[in-house]
Design a protein with these regions (language model features):
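Short acidic/polar hinge/loop motifs at secondary-structure boundaries
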Residues: 3, 39-67
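Residues embedded in well-ordered regular secondary structure
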Residues: 3-6, 14-20, 28-30, 34, ...
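Short beta-strands and strand-coil junctions in structured, solvent-facing domains, enriched
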Residues: 6-8, 28-30, 43-45, 63-68, ...
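Soluble periplasmic/extracytoplasmic beta-strand elements of cell-envelope proteins
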Residues: 8, 20-24, 34-39, 56-60, ...
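Short, glycine-/polar-rich solvent-exposed loops and beta-turns at beta-strand/coil boundaries
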Residues: 10-17, 49-52, 69-74, 184-187, ...
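Flexible glycine-/small-residue-rich
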Residues: 11, 23-27, 38-39, 61, ...
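Extracellular/periplasmic, surface-exposed regions of secreted and cell-surface proteins
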Residues: 33, 123, 150-153, 188, ...
Length: 652
């Protein structure tokens, strides 16, 4: 975070939550996550990895590097290589750490007196009588009530060993984290195994495995604590109950501590993840290398949530005790599985002759992704309270007459052919080009399943020219530029081939009149649907000064997303469908300066980077169309403005 120009990393503070990473802005309304490539396997998250098992991480931003990833490369690529054994004796490494975290910069809120004054001013402006705050004597900072100081610990052990022909790595880790909100806790156990064996001098095989068991945190929202009136006391000691909120709020929200405390530990969730690959690599005819790799990733997530009966103190009702909700216990249960299977076949040619150097790669890859989810919910039967016991939190114990269910499933496949060439002349003039052709089942019914992606790039190492040799303080100067096209098929829903008929309404027809069921299409099919395309280019320079101690890099970039996937407004009583109806532009400047030096046996470094990102929606569906998000409709996306800009009154 903060070390690489053009990369934004946002941590929510929730225990175990994945950081939000954006590379050079937001390219689409349908997802911003970069592609992770872990030891060759494509992935959309890396929560199964132990940070201690990561050997290196590289972030690709420029078009010439991303185009080779085709339909998956539009949002940037993060390449992660996990640790492997290095030749030498067997080594055992054990490390552990612990720490604490807390919210140090809370949002400033008015106290009870200030709230009463502002709320009554609002009522007067609306022509309404003032609210009687007489029974509301509290002065509560709800943020203080819900926040805690969280404890964090990470513990790892690894064993490595290698010989001239064989190497292995075994790593295991345990992480535990408490969240910023009371009762939040998260734990993860990880396992990493790799084994490589050199069968002959020119043929080797190996495998990689990563596994994880995660107990995710039952996270609660901070929003209620920011909206709850400070005039309400937290707790009524006489009744031993949390208090309700004033009448103007209690219909919309509960006392924040009801969710944080009384609903704590009411969810039992377990996530399992297994990811790995096997490969074979053959070097032949001096300059050729052929590599085959088969990879698989499987995730299984299950959860059970219990709904307890909750009573709160309310002085405005007879008896002063109110039961929230329907007064019934309930259980919700779900199971989700996702499988990813990938195969890669790569042929590489490398040669150097005279002043020329060439590396060429050709390949064929396949990728398959399938997700299935099934969930259900039941409440208690008459007089049959579901016990507050995790062993009983299964929907089979509830009343079948109250059962509801949900499901989600989809599968997609991608087939790709690719090629890339890297060439340099005299180590001064650098050229590269790539081509990738992707075919996706997501668009197979439209006839637009195939898409080509290209890139070209060039660099000039000016410092290697004769006319630069006399500049002693300049060690390296390089000018560079690239252009490429990228793709994006990401959408938070499947691409169904045929719409279903749903029995949504009834109609009266005939004489004598009779009621007949009415049907409508579940969505508007679009036979011309195609995936989003991103055209990007950049130009910049790199330089090293003062015996390579000072490094500078500056880049200007521009990316334009076309054929943006968006929902088409419903017409003639139909549900909205999906269409290519928008475009987005991102452009900006990246500057980075780093200084590295040594003083005796001590090394030190200092760095600074600056990134500007200007995001703008160029067009979206039709004039005046907007996408509204947020519980108070405070986030808008519409043409002429950035994605998700804040919408509201301007005040001084």
């Amino acid at each position: 975070q903060g070390k690489i120009a053009g990369v934004q990393v946002i941590n929510s503070g929730k225990a175990g939550a994945d950081p939000e990473i954006r590379v050079r802005g937001t390219n689409s309304i349908n997802g911003y996550k970069p592609l992770y490539v872990v030891d060759g396997l494509f992935n959309d998250n890396i929560n199964f990895l132990n940070p201690q098992d990561i050997e290196s991480m590289e972030i690709l931003k420029d078009p010439s590097s991303l185009a080779i990833f085709g339909v998956r490369g539009a949002n940037g690529v993060i390449i992660i290589t996990t640790k492997k054994a290095k030749e030498g004796q067997t080594r055992v490494n054990i490390n552990g750490s612990f720490g604490f975290k807390r919210v140090t910069d809370k949002i400033a809120m008015v106290d009870a007196a200030g709230f009463k004054e502002l709320y009554n001013e609002q009522l007067r402006n609306e022509g309404n009588p003032e609210f009687d705050f007489t029974p509301w004597t509290g002065n509560t900072d709800w943020q203080d009530e819900i926040f805690q100081t969280g404890f964090i610990t990470n513990n790892n052990v690894s064993i490595t060993g290698a010989s001239a022909r064989h190497s292995f790595y075994l790593g295991a880790g345990y992480a535990y984290e408490q969240g910023n909100i009371k009762h939040e806790k998260y734990s993860k156990v990880t396992l990493n195994i790799s084994n490589d064996y050199k069968v002959t001098d020119n043929f080797k095989v190996g495998f990689q495995f990563n596994g994880a068991r995660i107990l995710p945190a039952d996270t609660k929202s901070v929003a209620t604590a920011l909206r709850a009136a400070p005039v309400a006391p937290v707790y009524n000691a006489e009744y031993g109950l949390y208090t309700t909120l004033p009448g103007f709020q209690k219909a919309q929200m509960n006392n924040p501590m009801v969710d944080v405390d009384l609903k704590a530990n009411t969810t039992r969730a377990e996530n399992y993840r297994a990811s790995g690959n096997v490969y074979g690599q053959w070097d032949f005819l001096k300059n050729f290398q052929f590599k085959v790799m088969y990879s698989m990733d499987y995730a299984s997530n299950s959860s059970r949530t219990y709904t307890p009966v909750i009573n709160v103190f309310d002085s405005s009702v007879e008896g002063n005790v109110v039961t929230l909700g329907n007064g019934k216990t309930g259980v919700k249960q779900s199971k989700e599985t996702e499988a990813k299977v990938q195969s890669d076949y790569l042929l590489t040619y490398t040669n150097t002759w005279g002043d020329h150097s060439l590396t060429a790669t050709a390949g064929f890859t396949t990728y398959y992704n399938k997700l299935e989810m099934l969930g259900g919910e039941r409440t208690q039967g008459v007089g049959l309270v579901i016990p507050d016991n995790p062993d009983k939190w299964y929907i089979s114990i509830g009343d079948a007459a109250t059962a509801t269910n949900e499901s989600k499933q989809w599968e997609r496949s991608t087939v790709s052919m690719l090629g890339r060439v890297l060439y340099n002349y005299k180590g001064r003039y650098l050229f590269n080009g790539s081509f990738r052709r992707d075919g996706s089942s997501a668009f197979s019914y439209t006839g637009n399943q195939w898409q080509n992606f290209y890139s070209v790039g060039a660099g000039w190492l000016m410092s290697e020219e004769e006319f630069m040799k006399d500049i002693t303080w300049l060690d390296m100067l390089k000018l560079k530029g690239s252009w490429g096209t990228l793709g994006n098929q990401n959408l938070d829903k499947a691409y169904p081939a045929e719409p279903l008929l749903t029995n949504a309404y009834s109609a009266v027809f005939g004489k004598p009149s009779a009621i007949y069921p009415g049907y409508q299409l579940s969505y508007l099919p679009n036979p011309r649907l195609r995936w989003e395309k991103v055209e990007a280019w950049e130009a910049g320079a790199e330089a090293n000064f003062f015996r390579n101690r000072l490094h500078f890099e500056g880049v200007y970039y521009k990316k334009t997303t076309k054929d943006l996937l968006a929902e088409v407004p419903g017409i003639s009583g139909t549900v909205p469908g999906i269409g290519n109806l928008g475009s987005i532009e991102n452009k900006g400047v990246e500057l980075a300066i780093d200084w590295r030096d040594r003083i005796g046996d001590w090394g030190y470094s200092a760095g600074f980077n600056l990134t500007t990102i200007k995001n703008k929606v160029l067009s979206l569906v039709q004039e005046g169309y907007s996408i509204i998000a947020g519980d108070k409709s405070q986030s808008y996306t519409m043409a002429g403005y950035p994605i998700g800009y804040f919408y509201g009154y301007k005040v001084e």
